[in-house]
Amino acid sequence: MKTFKQFNEQSYSGTPFGTIHPMADLNAAAGDAKISKQDLDNVEKYADRLYKAVGIDVEFTRHFLDRVNDERNKKQITVAELIRMFKQSFKKYGKKIAQLGPDAEAVINDMQTDVNMPFALRWDNKNQELDLVAKTVMRKKNFATSNQKFQFK
């Protein structure tokens, strides 16, 4: 796909656009931006508010941040997709996830976007609550696991 600058250099016969610097690339894909630590912190705050109703605190590993921006995902995983994943999983499986108890492992699978998030539940003695530790995230069709899968469309 041509960028705004490439398109205009080829179609404009006046002053070359190489001398003018556009403020923004209007044709750039919106989903190409990498997710920052701050973005992930905001997603975590949102997920914490959702899952607080069932006594779960959401945490992300450092590997999660690395993997969310990994090239192997082919299409960049967006903040909106992560928020959707937490919202839909809570709506459909919130109480069921809380009943798994400590030391349980499972995968949340969004079949619409093919985003998979393996997680572990750990008991937090300090706060007396379950921690949902999101270990990693990846975009992959037909994700195979031996752990329980919580799927939604």
What are these regions (language model features)?
Residues 2-153:
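Ribonuclease/tRNase effector modules and their secretory precursors
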